[in-house]
Amino acid sequence: MGRDSVVKETTLESFLAEKSVKRGDASWKKTIGLNVHDDINGDGEINALDKKAAGDFDLWHEHAVDGVGHRWGMAIDLTSCIGCSACVTACHIENNVPVVGKDEVRRHRDMHWMRIDRFYASDWDMERGEKEGVGVISTYGKMEEPGANPQTVHMPMMCQHCNHAPCETVCPVAATTHSNEGVNQMTYNRCIGTRYCANNCPFKVRRFNWFHYPGYDKFQNFNPAQDAIQRMVLNPDVVVRSRGVMEKCSLCVQRTQSAKLEAKKAGAPLEDGSAITACAEACPTNAITFGDLNDTSSEVRSTYDNNRTYHALEEVGVQPNVAYLTKVRNTPNS
C-alpha cells in the first residue's frame, strides 16, 4: 500500500493511448492485487505470485445496494480540483463546524469535516526503481526527494461513507450506523467519545470535540456563536455538537431530506440535482458531483462509471460511496 493507493495520476499522452483499455488494465490505474494462501495461478505452488484483485475480497456478507431506493454518492475529479478550499469553507458554514484556532490545530485537535490533501509528484516511482535495480525501501526514499519542478495534486478528503465501514463495527454503543440510503450516519446523543471509530477509519476523517466550542470563552475570538445575536449564524437544520462526541461528514443529510420532502409535496419523483451538498454547490470548477447512484440517468452515476474512476485505498475493501477520477496532466509528472 503506497501513494498510488490513494491518489492516481497520468499524462494526457498516456491517457489517450490507453483510453479504450478495460478499467484496471491501464498503466495508470492497475488493478490492485493481494496475496492469498491459495494456488491462484495454477502453477502447483503457493507463493507470492498468487494474487487476487482487491475487489474480489469481501470481509462482510453482501447486501443489496444497487437499485434499492436512493443510494447517495459522490465523484470527485482530481483534474478539475484546484485546491481553493471553497468546499471546506462551505462545509464549515453549512454544518456548523466550529473554528478551533491555530493553538488547537497545533495540538492536533483540528476540526474539519473535509480537508484538502496535497501531494507532490516525484521523479521516481516503483517502475523506475525496478528498472534501475533499486530496492523497494531505497525507492521509497528517493520518492521523497523533491523534483526540480514538482507538480501538485489536490485531493478533497471527507468521510467516504463506506458500505463496509470499519468505524461501524467497533463502536461499542452503535453511535455510528449505516442508513438504508448508503450514508454513514452519527447519533450524537448516543456517542460516548471512545474514539475507536477514528482509530479504525483508514481515511482519518473523523474528529473529536475536545471542548464545547460555541460556549467556551477561550474560543470567542474566532468562534462567532458565543451570544444570542451571533448564534444566528448557525444553520438551524444542523445540530450543534457538544463536548466529548465524534463528528464527521454527513453528506449534508439535511439537504437530501429537504429535497425528498419537496419532491413528495409536489407529488413528483426526485430530480437529479435537486439534492446537492454544500461542497459540490460551492466548487467553482464543478470538480465535485453529488447525487443518487441508483439513478442510472444521474450525472454522478455517469461520472462514477467513467474509465478514470477509482476508490482510495481500494485494497482495504471498505467499498466507499465516494469515488475519485484520476488526475490527467498535459505535462509529465516532473
Q: Language-model segments: what does each one mean?
A:
Residues M1-S334:
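Non-ligating segments of multi-cofactor redox enzymes
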